Amino acid sequence: MELTIEKAIQQAVAEHKKGNLQKAESAYRQVLKVMPAHAAANHNLGILLVDLYQSNNGLKFLHAALQGNQKVEQFWLSYINALINLDKLDIANEFIGAARKAGFSGPKFASLSERMLSPVELRAKGKFFQANDVNYLHFLRALHRNVYEGYFEIGTRTGASLVLSQSPSIAIDPFFQLSENPIGNKDFCLMFQETSDSFFENRLPKLSGLKCQLAFIDGMHLFEYALKDFINLAKISSEEALFLFHDPIPWTFKMATRNNEMLERNEAWTGDIWKLVHILIDAGMKDNVNLLSSAPSGLLAVLNPDKKIIAKLEKNYDKICAQWLDVELNEDNLLKFYETGVFVKPEVYLQSLEQISFGNRKANISKDWISQ
């Protein structure tokens, strides 16, 4: 029987590594039906749920793994990591102390302790805040459990993010390099191979009834383009809408440059998307803005922006661009960025969306969504 269990674990791990998460979850749960205290199955299922932004569900399995075998360092690390994801910092600190008493310490535990520091506290130690929570694509996958009135994506490239959507979708990219079929379970998906400026100027007037309830903006890595895309999308947004910008959290000064030719080949580049945080806060959106620490370079989330503020941003667009164009990310500006106080754990943010039932209503798709 033990061999059968171990074979089942191996198969589950293989599916997990391939990214077949539903099959892996089912296999782990089958093992736990037979052996509820199986430490590896509990641990791996917990990790899988954490990767799916379900740390609350994963905690009990990670805790069961730790209770089953406290001699495995990774069981301590995984449980503490899940607690930090949920901002349960006091409990996480208690378990770091317990791990030390059990004989575990070293750089991995030091790294977990650093994850509990605020950006300002980290900078006081001479370190950058790094977005090292679960990957942003997993965050998007969690959002796309719901169906939205309309999903817009600017900067689709390979389609890795677009494929996650189950909603009627619009994708815009000047040069698609799709690696898989993006249609999936969507009722439809319109793809426009052009710049976003061209789309909003030439295509949008020919389309009727478009509503943007969820948007992912991952285009030029330059603030003025992202700001213009945001303004254009917000003008056709639903009453409740969420906008996500990729790459707002650089972890070096160099990667925040506007000129990516200054970087080495394959060196990470966020551009100056970070400026949008200040621009939107200055415009009066602090209550709508959050920075999510989804790896590798974060997400800027803007929830339910005020249409009056959007109109002011559009009116003052040239002035705002002139004001911010030559601003660089130096030590003073980095600290001001960290002091905005809008950083939040992505899983905590997801929970806040669930509390207000954002996106929990099925999309009402009209056949007139596209003009004839």
PLM features per residue range, with description:
Residues 3-34:
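Alpha-helical segment of the N-proximal tetratricopeptide repeat
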Residues 15-17, 50, 66-67, 81-85, ...:
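A short alpha-helical cap/connector motif
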